[in-house]
């Protein structure tokens, strides 16, 4: 019996509870490379099945990398040193640089929060989902808040990844540059959260798939993988 047939015969309440687990299982079994599956397995269990990002409490993710200290403080990467100097000179303050007094009314049809054609409501109507103009406006607002919430959660992951890279990288100029990346990601977290909190007044939970990526990066011992993941997020 396939999954679809099984879901069809289940009572509605039971189906709504077990459906996310079947979807999570499909995601995990879609990974064909056994090495990738093994590396993502623990994070997938914590994110997709246990839903550690949706329990309403801070999440503890064990780190396995080593912090690399160099007590001679060498100047060992001229390119990184140059990036560090540029990053210092280009710092900006999100609290001061952005005009937070700008009024944002997500329900104002005259100033849509996202383009009206961003969502194909005609396609939804083909499936029997018909919304009033007010419902369409609210739906666009909710979609925007959800997307920005995931950006925010991703930036928190990038913030922690940058901090871990700074600890684990083995050339000292890279650590100096990494410190500026930590500040950059902190600024992103600050700005995204403030916009969601003061303008949209809504924050969605972290997406399970995004949690898996963040969990896998945080617990990976390789600094270069953390650096790559930081750029992706």
Where are these regions (language model features)?
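Terminal targeting/low-complexity segments that flank the catalytic cores of oxidoreductases
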Residues: 1-163, 168-173, 198-205, 209, ...
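Conserved short hydrophobic patches within well-ordered secondary structure
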Residues: 136-140, 179, 233
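Short linear capping/connector segments at secondary-structure termini
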Residues: 210-214
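Acidic/serine-rich, low-complexity amphipathic helices located in mid- to C-terminal regulatory regions
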Residues: 224-233
């Amino acid at each position: 019996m396939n999954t679809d047939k099984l879901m069809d015969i289940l009572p509605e309440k039971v189906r709504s509870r077990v459906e996310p687990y079947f979807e999570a299982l499909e995601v995990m079994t879609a990974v064909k490379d056994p090495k990738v599956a093994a590396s993502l397995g623990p994070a997938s269990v914590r994110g997709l099945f246990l839903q550690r990002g949706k329990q309403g409490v801070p999440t503890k993710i064990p780190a396995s990398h080593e912090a690399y200290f160099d007590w001679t403080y060498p100047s060992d990467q001229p390119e990184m040193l140059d990036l560090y100097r540029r990053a210092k000179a280009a710092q900006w303050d999100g609290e001061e640089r952005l005009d937070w007094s700008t009024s944002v009314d997500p329900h104002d049809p005259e100033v849509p929060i996202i383009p009206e054609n961003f969502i194909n409501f005609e396609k939804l109507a083909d499936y029997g989902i018909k919304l009033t103009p007010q419902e369409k406006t609210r739906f666009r607002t909710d979609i925007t808040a959800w997307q920005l919430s995931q950006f925010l959660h991703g930036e928190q992951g990038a913030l922690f990844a940058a901090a871990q890279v700074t600890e684990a990288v083995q050339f000292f100029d890279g650590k100096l540059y990494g410190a500026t990346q930590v500040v950059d990601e902190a600024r992103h977290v600050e700005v995204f959260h403030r916009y969601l909190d003061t303008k949209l007044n809504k924050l969605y939970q972290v997406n399970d798939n995004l949690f898996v990526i963040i969990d896998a990066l945080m617990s990976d011992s390789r600094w270069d993988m953390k650096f790559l993941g930081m750029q992706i997020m």
